């Protein structure tokens, strides 16, 4: 059971706190000036009691007793002059360990919050998401329209396809024939003119398919592996006379 606090205890505590906080000598007159509500007799008795209890140091000077704080063994006081509870090294280390553990928890929490903040910052805003949704919706409608066109478009009949193949084959055949005819004529001219092909080309001014970057129509009548873009052993001359 805790000790009941009496008025005497309060007086002792107030006087002791005043002297310890000021940390300078006091006589009863100075205490009386600080606490006008206390009487001289009460102050003198209280100072004497504190001195006898070893809570204050005192000495008589010229028939006046001076009291001051015990410097060597006095307890540590806070800013208000109250005694600070003393703790052992073990208690302090244990308290420090607890603070360090709490610090680690707070640091982990901070890291987690920073990570969450970065993730939120990297996410699209509602406005950006709506813009992207609108763009994708527009692209989807365009693709659906193209798909519908392909689905409803009339497919080429076999007859039309055959007609197109025949036209391509005929065009290629005529192309090959004319290239061969020109090559034969060119060989005869070269044989009679005694000129080199390069010189004769400069005089006449013809251009080859390669000069004009024209590719031979593939021969679709052959397997894909045998199709060529130009005839073998053919210099692919394409006639273009100078005017």
Curated annotation (Swiss-Prot):
Cited Pfam families: LZ3wCH, TBPIP
Keyword Iron applies: no
Main location: nucleus
GO BP term, pick one: meiotic strand invasion involved in reciprocal meiotic recombination
Keywords assigned by UniProt, alphabetized: Coiled coil, DNA recombination, DNA-binding, Meiosis, Nucleus
A Gene Ontology cellular-component term: condensed nuclear chromosome
Skewed-composition ranges (Polar residues): 223-235
Keyword Endoplasmic reticulum set for record: no
Coiled-coil ranges per UniProt: 86-153
InterPro entries, sorted: Hop2_WH_dom (IPR010776), LZ3wCH (IPR040661), WH-like_DNA-bd_sf (IPR036388)
PANTHER family: HOMOLOGOUS-PAIRING PROTEIN 2 HOMOLOG (PTHR15938:SF0), TBP-1 INTERACTING PROTEIN (PTHR15938)
Entry protein name: Homologous-pairing protein 2 homolog
Organism: Dictyostelium discoideum
Upper lineage: Eukaryota, Amoebozoa, Evosea, Eumycetozoa, Dictyostelia
Name of the gene: hop2
């Amino acid at each position: 059971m805790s000790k009941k606090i009496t008025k005497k205890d309060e007086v002792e505590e107030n006087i002791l706190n005043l002297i310890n906080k000021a940390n300078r000598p006091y006589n009863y007159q100075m205490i009386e000036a600080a606490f006008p509500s206390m009487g001289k007799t009460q102050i003198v008795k209280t100072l004497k009691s504190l001195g006898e209890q070893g809570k204050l140091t005192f000495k008589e000077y010229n028939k006046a007793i001076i009291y001051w704080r015990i410097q060597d063994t006095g307890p540590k006081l806070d800013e208000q002059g109250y005694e600070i509870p003393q703790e052992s090294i073990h208690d302090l280390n244990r308290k420090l360990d607890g603070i360090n553990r709490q610090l680690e928890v707070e640091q982990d929490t901070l890291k987690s919050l920073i990570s969450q903040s970065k993730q939120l910052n990297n996410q699209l805003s509602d406005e950006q998401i709506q813009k992207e949704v609108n763009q994708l919706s527009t692209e989807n409608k365009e693709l659906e329209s193209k798909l519908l066109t392909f689905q409803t478009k009339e497919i080429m009949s076999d007859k039309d396809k055959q007609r197109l193949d025949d036209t391509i084959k005929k065009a290629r055949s005529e192309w090959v024939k004319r290239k061969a005819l020109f090559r034969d004529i060119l060989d005869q001219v070269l044989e009679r003119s005694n000129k080199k092909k390069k010189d004769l080309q400069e005089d006449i001014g013809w251009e080859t398919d390669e000069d004009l970057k024209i590719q031979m129509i593939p021969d679709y009548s052959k397997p894909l592996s045998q199709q060529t873009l130009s005839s073998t052993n053919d210099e692919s001359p394409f006639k273009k006379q100078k005017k």
